[in-house]
C-alpha cells in the first residue's frame, strides 16, 4: 500500500504550522497570554501595536497622552480662546526581522515521517519563541539585561532593532528593606522583598503624577470593571516574601485571590501567588537578576516590576501575510538535510514620556540564590 505523506513546503503545511506557532505563543507566553491587549485604548501592561499587519515599515509610531491640567471656565466667562492643547507625546518602536532555524537531521537519521518531523520542529520552535518573547519583554520593562545565566541572549545584549534598554528613572525606582536604601549601591543583604515595599509602590502609584504635574500617573489595568495593578516578582523574591509573612500572613494573601478574583479575570490572575490591596502578585522565572549591587558591588539582587497600563509596547506582524509567523522548510545538501525556519517582524520597547517611565515601577531588592540552597 502506498504511504500517504504531506509533501514538504506544501502550502497547507506552511499555513498550519506558522499559525500554530502564533497560537502557542498567545496561549502559553507569559506576557502574551495574560497581560497584553491591542487597540486604541489598551487596558493591559503590554500594548500590542498591530500596524505591522497592515503596512510595511521599519518603525511604528505610537502616542501617549496625559491628563488635562487647565482650569474650567465658570459662569458667563467667554470660553472661546481657552482651549487646552492636548498633552500628547509620540515615540517610535523600531522593528526588524527575527528568525530561528532548526535542523531536523539528515535522511540517514530520519526514521520518522515528514509529519512527525514537522510536529517536533513546531514544538521546539514554539518553545523557543515563547521563551525569547518572555525574556525580551521582561528585559525591556526592567531596562536591563541583568546577569541571568539561562537567557538566550548573553549579558552583553543591549536590545533588538535599534530599541535600546532604558534604565528606570528616579521617580519610578524603589528599593527593598526598611527604607534606608536609596540606590542599588546602598542595598544590603537584609533589604529583601516584602509587603512594605509593595505598600510604598501602591502609595506612590496613587499619589505621583497626574493633574498639573508632567509626570505620568500609573493607571491600573481594568479587568471586568475592577482596577488591579500587577506586580511581577522573581522566584527568590517570592521565597523571601513567604518567609516574611509566615503561614498565617501568606494565607490571607492567597485567600484574597480565592475570594477576590472572578472567572472573567482568569487570565490576569491565573497562577497568581495572591492579591494584596488589589495588586495581583505574579512570579516569573525570567525576572531580571543582578550580582553587582551593594557597597562592594557583589550583592545579588532582583528587579520586580510593578505594572500599570502601557508599561511597554510590542509591535508584531508581517504585512500581507495571513499568519504572524512565517514557516519555511528547505532541503540542504542535495535533499540530505531538512531545515525549518520560523520568523516574524517585531520590536519591543518600554513606554516612556519625556524621559520618564510611563507605566512601570522597578522594585529592586536583595535576592540571594544561596538562600534557597542552604
Regions found by a protein language model. Give the residues of each.
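Structural recognition of the beta-strand scaffold that forms the well-ordered cores
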Residues: 61-63, 103, 230-232
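Core alpha/beta structural scaffold of self-assembling particle/tube/pore-forming proteins
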Residues: 3-23, 27, 111-374
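Short acidic, glycine/tyrosine-flanked loop/strand segments centered on an H-E-D-like triad
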Residues: 84-113, 307-318
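Short, solvent-exposed loop/turn segments at the edges of secondary structure
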Residues: 57, 95-97, 226, 335
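Short active-site-adjacent helix-start/loop capping segments
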Residues: 69-73, 102-103, 111-112, 336
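N-terminal, well-ordered alpha-helical segments
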Residues: 58-60, 64, 100, 123, ...
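N-terminal "assembly arms/tails" that initiate or stabilize quaternary assembly
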Residues: 1-95, 349-374
Amino acid at each position: 500500500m502506498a504511504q500517504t505523506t504531506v509533501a514538504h513546503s506544501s502550502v497547507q503545511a506552511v499555513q498550519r504550522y506558522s499559525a500554530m506557532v502564533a497560537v502557542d505563543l498567545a496561549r502559553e507566553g507569559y506576557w502574551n497570554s495574560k497581560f497584553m491587549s491591542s487597540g486604541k485604548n489598551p487596558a493591559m501592561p503590554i500594548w500590542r501595536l498591530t500596524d505591522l499587519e497592515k503596512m510595511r515599515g521599519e518603525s511604528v509610531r505610537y502616542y501617549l497622552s496625559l491628563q488635562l491640567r487647565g482650569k474650567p471656565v465658570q459662569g458667563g466667562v467667554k470660553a472661546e480662546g481657552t482651549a487646552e492643547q492636548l498633552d500628547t507625546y509620540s515615540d517610535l518602536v523600531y522593528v526588524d526581522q527575527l528568525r530561528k532555524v532548526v535542523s531536523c537531521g539528515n535522511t540517514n537519521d530520519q526514521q520518522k515521517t515528514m509529519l512527525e518531523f514537522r510536529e517536533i520542529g513546531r514544538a521546539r520552535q514554539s518553545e523557543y519563541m515563547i521563551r525569547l518573547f518572555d525574556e525580551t519583554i521582561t528585559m525591556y520593562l526592567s531596562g536591563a539585561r541583568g546577569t541571568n545565566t539561562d537567557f538566550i541572549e548573553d549579558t552583553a545584549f543591549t536590545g533588538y532593532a535599534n530599541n535600546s534598554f532604558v534604565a528606570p528613572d528616579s521617580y519610578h525606582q524603589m528599593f527593598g528593606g526598611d527604607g534606608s536604601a536609596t540606590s542599588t549601591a546602598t542595598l544590603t543583604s537584609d533589604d529583601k522583598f516584602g509587603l512594605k515595599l509593595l505598600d510604598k509602590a501602591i502609595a506612590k502609584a496613587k499619589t505621583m503624577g497626574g493633574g498639573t504635574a508632567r509626570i505620568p500617573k500609573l493607571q491600573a489595568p481594568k479587568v471586568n470593571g475592577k482596577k488591579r495593578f500587577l506586580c511581577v516578582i522573581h522566584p527568590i523574591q517570592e521565597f523571601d516574601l513567604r518567609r516574611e509573612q509566615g503561614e498565617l500572613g501568606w494565607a490571607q494573601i492567597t485567600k484574597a485571590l480565592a475570594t477576590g478574583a472572578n472567572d472573567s479575570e482568569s487570565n490576569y490572575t491565573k497562577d497568581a501567588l495572591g492579591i494584596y490591596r488589589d495588586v495581583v502578585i505574579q512570579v516569573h522565572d525570567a525576572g531580571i537578576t543582578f550580582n553587582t549591587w551593594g557597597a562592594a558591588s557583589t550583592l545579588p539582587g532582583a528587579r520586580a516590576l510593578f505594572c500599570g497600563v502601557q508599561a511597554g509596547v510590542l509591535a508584531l506582524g508581517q504585512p500581507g501575510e495571513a499568519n504572524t509567523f512565517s514557516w519555511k522548510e528547505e532541503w540542504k545538501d542535495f535533499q540530505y538535510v531538512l531545515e525549518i525556519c520560523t520568523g516574524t517582524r517585531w520590536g519591543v520597547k518600554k513606554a516612556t514620556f519625556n524621559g520618564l517611565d510611563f507605566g512601570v515601577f522597578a522594585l529592586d531588592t536583595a535576592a540571594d540564590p544561596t538562600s534557597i540552597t542552604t
